[in-house]
Amino acid sequence: MTLLPGDNSHYDYSALSCASDTSFHPAFFPQRQAIKGVFYRRAQRLRPQDDLHQSCSLGDRRRQIIINVGGIKYSLPWTTLDEFPLTRLGQLKACTNFDDILSVCDDYDVTCNEFFFDRNPGAFGTILTFLRAGKLRLLREMCALSFQEELLYWGIAEDHLDGCCKRRYLQKIEEFAEMMEREEEEEPLDSEDQESEGPSASEGRLSRCMRRLRDMVERPHSGLPGKVFACLSVLFVTVTAVNLSVSTLPSLREEEEQGQCSQMCHNVFIVESVCVGWFSLEFLLRFIQAPSKFAFLRSPLTLIDLVAILPYYVTLLVDGAASSRRKPSTGNSYLDKVGLVLRVLRALRILYVMRLARHSLGLQTLGLTARRCTREFGLLLLFLCVAIALFAPLLYVIENEMADSPEFTSIPACYWWAVITMTTVGYGDMVPRSTPGQVVALSSILSGILLMAFPVTSIFHTFSRSYLELKQEQERVLIRRAQYLIKTKSQLSGMSQDSDILFGSASSDTRDNN
């Protein structure tokens, strides 16, 4: 049967009869070199059924190199490696003897000129793509840390990664570095726990006390003392927040301004003193059990504790100095001068609420997300600033030209209106009256919704990932702690069994002698 043309062409298709496979006319399929073939000649993967001994002639050895990575073989021309002389594969060309070859690869087959590398073949696929195409990309299913080790082994710089892959690669490396820092902070604690069972009785007693103190202060899940200590800390933070709110009542403020102190004011001061005393004791205990005092003082939560505790003592010192300098003729002039400073210092007591981050996984996740999403927060702020700078002057000009009674007196006032409008708060203190002004307001509202939605997605994914990481880390610490306790109990039980055997044999010998 002859194929019939469907496009009214006059080409003779009779030679393409299906009766035989040998009827293909060479004129219909002209021989030409494919562009893809030229591109992929730089490197190719060999199939298992390929006969390597047929291509192991002397001429092929001079032109081709066979790489065996984890059991998968690749064929590369030597000219491909000339472009990458500093890589591990490029160093093979400079090898002059068998020892030099083995210093670069793991094994070498002289008969087939085959170099063996005991490495991950999946990662080498991306390396091979870089050698033949000049594009280095990180596959989604590949571990970034393993890929970093492969890059170091093959001698390829990370700068060759494409932009999108490099961003994801560096993010994973940064997250791993943060996890290693947290594990290094916990490693001295675990090592001290293991060293606390030393042979010296005095050192063992001191180490045991420090370990129990550390468990109570830093590890709420370690036992009953840690849970009680954490509950007391949260309770005192709550009492401090309530006490700060009560101290701002109008009646107490009037008494404070008049220099008087009623029973309620005295009770508020006593509650505040007790809470500050507890926080000071907690800070002292944390400082005593810290393995590195300098690292403890540099931590953000420690700085928050200092900023929250010191205003109380500074206020006491200032009040004492004011009472000593006060004269009957001057009244409260000195207190009037430092009154603003005292009010600011007392307002810093609200930072006690940040202490809840020690016991809340959610607050820790929030802080870690804010540290990781600084770029996204910067973009959000930039978007809002550009939009505010655009809509505020435009609304000011429109309202002052077209509205009968304009409410926008200046461009800075329009800035405030733009911030409230774009964040969809809408106080309603300033409202555009003209129709063009209302159109500008609608545009600013829609722009604010869209601009805030762009970075929020990335921030949400970062928050979810950070929460999972911290939760897994917390579970890992609990498992490590449980394993340590099980190991300790097994050692103690073994020692008790040995002592029973020892003393039991001694008592039996005594009975035999008797």
Curated annotation (Swiss-Prot):
Question: Which stretch carries the motif Selectivity filter?
Answer: 424-429
Q: Alphabetically, which GO biological process terms does the record hold?
A: potassium ion transport; protein homooligomerization; regulation of potassium ion transmembrane transport
Q: Which UniProt keywords apply?
A: Cell membrane, Ion channel, Ion transport, Membrane, Potassium, Potassium channel, Potassium transport, Transmembrane, Transmembrane helix, Transport, Voltage-gated channel
Q: Where is the composition biased (Acidic residues)?
A: 180-196
Q: Which stretches face the Cytoplasmic side? A: 1-224, 290-300, 360-374, 468-514
Transcription listed as a keyword: no
Q: What is this protein called?
A: Voltage-gated potassium channel regulatory subunit KCNG1
The record's listing under Pfam families reads: BTB_2, Ion_trans
| Domain text | The transmembrane segment S4 functions as a voltage-sensor and is characterized by a series of positively charged amino acids at every third position. Channel opening and closing is effected by a conformation change that affects the position and orientation of the voltage-sensor paddle formed by S3 and S4 within the membrane. A transmembrane electric field that is positive inside would push the positively charged S4 segment outwards, thereby opening the pore, while a field that is negative inside would pull the S4 segment inwards and close the pore.
Q: Which residues lie within the membrane without crossing it?
A: 412-423, 424-431
